[in-house]
Amino acid sequence: MTLKFVKKQNEVGDVWSFFFEPLEPVDFVAGQYLNLTMPGVPPAVSDRLFTIASAPHEPLLQFTTIIGPSHFKQKLNSLKTGQEVEADQLGGDFTWEAVPSALSNDGVKRLFIAGGIGITPYLSIIRYLIHKQQPINATLLYAGKNEKRPFVEELHTAVEIDPTLIIKEYSETRLTLEQLKKDVPNVEHYIVYLAGSQAFSEALGEGLIEDGFPRQQIKYDYFDGYVDLEY
């Protein structure tokens, strides 16, 4: 599919959002990803997976990322309005709807854990549920330095709209397994979603599993290329 670049906006620090108009309808589920192919970039590094930050009902596709020195990121950051990029490989089960078959989707508790830019799939899900006027019924643990955590104000507004969304923020202290279990003492009753750098997500996920948490109740969305959180 072809996407036409519309605009970019700074979210916080070196975190930017890029907005594209799809030239054909994109039928996706909140929390899924697309692969973008950047023109003018060597083939070996011209592709990258991005979680879609926008919700399915929104007219533009939003991708949010940290702008670094890579050839791909620099090309993305230099796109002009009207330029086109190709997208494919729509997929992913890091979604509200995808829960283990042994659990009922009605009334299931969800624990969203985000490290920095890993907030994007949750943003898509939260926007979608608010649009549908469907209770979120989730706890979000959001970790990372303030200059690495976009959309904080929007998330606070979401809590005002729907108090069934509970947010705990970790900007000064590291979110460890011990802190997680302290802040969510009945974590074994949740489906746990983990999104962020591989090191961040695996440290918490594997720690839970070692404590006896069912592996099938953990969902991962790794953000390749990002180092562990900075505090």
Model regions: which residues?
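Ferredoxin-reductase
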Residues: 2-84, 88, 144-146
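FNR/FR-type flavoprotein reductase catalytic core
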Residues: 68-231
